Amino acid sequence: MDTFTIEEIVKFDGGGGGISTINSNNDNIGIPSNTFEMIISTIQHFLDRSSSVASTIAVFVLSFILFFMFGWFYFLKILFRDYEVKKVFVQLSFSITFALSLTLFELIFFEIMDFMDREWRYRFWEFDLTLMSINLILVLPYYQFYLLVLAYGFSKRKTLFFSLVLLVLYLILFWKIGDPFPILKEYTGLVSLEMGIGRIGIVGCTVMSLLSGYGAVYVPYSYITYFLKPVKDVTITKLEKQFNHALDKIFNKKKRVVLLKRELTRRNVNNNNNNNNNYDTYNYNNNYNNNSNNNNNNNNSNNNNNNNLPIIGPIFSKIYNLWNVGYHHQLSRPIDDIKQLEREIKQLEDLNRDLFTQIHELKLERLRIQFSTTLRGKFYNWLGYFFSIYWKKKSALNIVFDRRGGMDPVTRGLDIALRYFHFQVDVTFWSQHISFILVGLMTASSIRGFLNQILKVFHEYSSSLSSNNIVLILAQVMGMYFISSVLMMRTSMPEIYTRFIVTQILGDIEFSFYHRWFDFIFIPSAIITTLALIFMSKSSTFHLNDE
């Protein structure tokens, strides 16, 4: 093995850039010649590693910021553009939950594409899940309780205390949710990431199955011609006339309310002026009476006058009180009329709201009837029949036979098709790429559908609850929904995609349970939605026939 002495100097050749050595006669020290190559290789590897880590961190941070900005924009410009949410922490909570949720899906796609450093991808995945768990289990519920207690007018210290008590009760109930369900393969301790994610997944999976059961029935219902109701133009015209007539009545009654309030204001101004004049007269009589009593001992000739003067004040007060009672009785009549008119206006506005809804639904029904006569509408009609039967059958078979995720649907379908046509194609390679595309489409569709659903829920209940409470509820449901989506995707995707990033961290979770629970909730949700739509269809038909 070549060695270098301690005085060997490594220098670079100015012309060729090579390495030359200067030997000396000193004793050799046994330093291997490849040590320098190892050092250079280590430094190069460290620099490459540092560059990879820096780019990985930059990608994660920038993507999180972009998701946060998109969530903030969606919050202000779409979801709550007609409502006022003054709490900045509420807006931050929604946007952060939205960004963390989308980052979960982003990391799954990066795992499929083998993008970013693998070790740091694992760390970011664990970091994201930990933040989501803390946010959904502790932060959002506590602030929700804080706003609810604060609305009752308690002091800040009492509000913090009662909110903490409610949070403890909530945590006990939340932890008890997972006891009846086999969410873990083995016990991992009282508090662990798997325990929290597993319980979050139960609630999120329930919400997902309810929405899916509703959508699986309502979408075919929208296209199947059997459920379409005949709509006459005469019916729409009649309802529009009633709507316009009610609008005129509302306008006239509101005009009367404005005139009565103006008249009431004028009378109040006149009453205040009269009160000031009467008060001055009453003070003058009292002052005159007091002066006369003070001069009683000095002027005995005025005793008769002084004895009569005290009677003037009480008599005037009685006359004033009688007049004031009559005046207030006159004022109460316009007030009663205003209250009666406001009640009538509210009834008419409720009637108009119902009429507007009926007109809108009838026009949509007429558009659906026109669409059903087209070639595309007929195709959607048969497609609606197919999916309405297929999804219920698939869920029922999964429950009855306890089917678990094996080969993913894309690989199975591609394998059957290629065997039938006798094509020699790498099924595993192409199924992975097709699965990746379908997973992306499925994720985008799921996010879009969920955002539309929470938009409908907010507009439905925003008048009965505080906007801040609605935002926190939606943020919590959204986070649970996305976590349960990841758990559901674990058994639907090929194992090679999620073997490291999902199974490595959440390996103790019983993923197949969530599919069975989804099917168990999906079927009742679909059946209830079917019965509700049939009942609504018949009731609306009877209503139209009555008109």
Curated annotation (Swiss-Prot):
It is a multi-pass membrane protein. One of its GO terms (biological process) is protein secretion. Its main location: membrane. GO terms for cellular component: endoplasmic reticulum membrane; Golgi membrane. It comes from the Eukaryota. The keyword Cell inner membrane does not apply. Pfam families: ABA_GPCR, GPHR_N. The keyword Transmembrane applies. InterPro entries: ABA_GPCR_dom, Golgi_pH-regulator_cons_dom, GPHR/GTG. Keywords: Glycoprotein, Membrane, Transmembrane, Transmembrane helix. It is found in: Membrane. Residues 268-305 are annotated as: Disordered. The chain crosses the membrane at residues 56-76, 92-112, 134-154, 164-184, 200-220, 427-447, 469-489, 517-537. This is Golgi pH regulator homolog. It comes from Dictyostelium discoideum.
